[in-house]
């Protein structure tokens, strides 16, 4: 049995927490796409762990972890993150994580190019994390990228990296980058990395009859290269299709597709955001929710819950259950708004589809309903019946608005135990 956890909005929904909870019973936890641009925090036994490229199943001592073929891996960050987890007391992290030999290598070169490309876009920049993810995926699509398995072949690796550097230097001129310096650093990584590299397909065959495989999505559906608010998206497939493709999953083995939705909406970086609140409500959400990016430290843009967006996300990803997170952040609001429809400039009303044109999204009007707040502390609650009546009504309104897909888990705080299971 395969369970897939996916972000339903623009990321930062709290996927790591439910993944951490579910990984307690998982044999294998996998990352299918993305790189160290992703970021989430897990609080376990009062210890805070920050994850970027590593699967958060590492917090569970019996869980094996795989970084799949659809990912891009910055090797220095991989080792730095492993070391940080070990320093915080996680056991056997070195022996419980593996990387597909088909994953692509994200170089420091890609980070340099990322910054140059963003600078050229000026006022229409995407707002990337600056980690080089886009240029790395671009090299992959152009068939000039370097795969993790190729690191082990010194001659091939060095030739391909020099060719990459030469191509970018022809395009941009002088680069603040020394290719020989990066090549020399990989001389140190080569043997160190070897035990982690596996043939993904044969590796997964060992688990084909196991009913406890957990897939941890990165980013979220609205950042998907095909289905998100293009071009203000990441460079990988962040939805259900990307999970299947990046890990060569058997679709018939998928039992659960869990959509993680924050009780309000946030976004990092540029791009349209219909329910964004550039006022005291947005600021209050930002402060109460501690909305700062784990990867970049940037303030997240904040706004009301968007049913239109989440209906679209549901239609693409086919969620079988939902995890509503950070409900407690709304505790101090007198009233809470939910977006239920958009009106386009020509008068067309949309309830369950999302415009492809970002310029059109910027011009639409949002229709809200207003629900009463509950003005009661819900942090740390673990029983649904203990929620204030208005908090229950809020949960059930969202559930009805999303075709009755059950909200099985409700987050009421940052720790693993701050969770209501319905």
Curated annotation (Swiss-Prot):
The active site is at residues 12, 40. It catalyses: IMP + L-aspartate + GTP = N(6)-(1,2-dicarboxyethyl)-AMP + GDP + phosphate + 2 H(+). One of its GO terms (cellular component) is cytoplasm. Homodimer. The keyword Glycoprotein does not apply. This is Adenylosuccinate synthetase. Binds 1 Mg(2+) ion per subunit. Keywords: Cytoplasm, GTP-binding, Ligase, Magnesium, Metal-binding, Nucleotide-binding, Purine biosynthesis. It is found in: Cytoplasm. Belongs to the adenylosuccinate synthetase family. Plays an important role in the de novo pathway and in the salvage pathway of purine nucleotide biosynthesis. Catalyzes the first committed step in the biosynthesis of AMP from IMP. GTP binds at residues 11-17, 39-41, 300, 326-328, 411-413.
């Amino acid at each position: 049995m395969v369970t897939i956890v996916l972000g339903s909005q623009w990321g930062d929904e709290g996927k790591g927490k439910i993944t951490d909870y579910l990984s307690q019973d998982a044999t294998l936890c996998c990352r299918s796409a993305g790189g160290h641009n992703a970021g989430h925090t897990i609080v376990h036994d009062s210890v805070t762990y920050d994850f970027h490229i590593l699967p958060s199943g590492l917090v569970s001592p019996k869980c094996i972890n795989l970084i799949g073929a659809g990912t891009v891996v910055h090797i220095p960050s991989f080792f730095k993150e492993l070391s940080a987890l070990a320093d915080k007391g996680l056991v056997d992290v070195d022996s419980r994580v593996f990387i597909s030999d088909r994953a692509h290598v994200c170089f420091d070169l890609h980070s340099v190019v990322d910054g140059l490309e963003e600078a050229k876009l000026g006022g229409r920049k995407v707002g990337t994390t600056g980690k080089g993810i886009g240029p790395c995926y671009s090299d992959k699509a152009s068939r000039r990228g370097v795969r993790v398995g190729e690191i082990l072949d010194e001659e091939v690796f060095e030739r391909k990296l020099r060719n990459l550097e030469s191509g970018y230097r022809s395009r941009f001129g002088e680069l603040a980058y020394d290719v020989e310096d990066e090549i020399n650093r990989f001389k140190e990584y080569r043997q160190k990395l070897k035990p982690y590299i596996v043939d993904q397909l044969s590796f997964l065959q060992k688990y084909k009859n196991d009913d406890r495989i957990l897939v941890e999505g990165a980013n979220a559906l609205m950042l998907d290269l095909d289905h998100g608010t293009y071009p203000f998206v990441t460079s990988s497939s962040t939805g259900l299709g990307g999970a299947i493709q990046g890990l060569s999953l058997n679709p018939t083995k998928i039992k659960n597709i869990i959509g993680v939705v924050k009780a309000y909406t946030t976004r990092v970086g540029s791009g349209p955001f219909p329910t964004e609140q550039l006022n005291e409500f947005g600021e209050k959400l930002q402060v109460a929710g501690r909305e700062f990016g784990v990867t970049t430290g940037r303030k997240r843009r904040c706004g009301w819950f968007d049913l239109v967006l989440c209906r679209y996300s549901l239609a693409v990803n086919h969620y079988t259950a939902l995890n509503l997170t950070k409900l407690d952040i709304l505790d101090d609001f007198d009233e809470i708004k939910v977006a239920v429809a958009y009106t386009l400039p020509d008068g067309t009303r949309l309830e369950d589809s999302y415009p492809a044109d970002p310029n059109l999204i910027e011009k639409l009007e949002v229709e809200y309903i207003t629900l009463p707040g509950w003005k009661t502390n819900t942090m740390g609650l673990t029983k649904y019946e203990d929620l204030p009546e208005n908090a229950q009504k809020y949960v059930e309104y969202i559930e009805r608005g999303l075709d009755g897909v059950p909200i099985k888990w409700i987050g009421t705080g940052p720790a693993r135990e701050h969770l209501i299971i319905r």
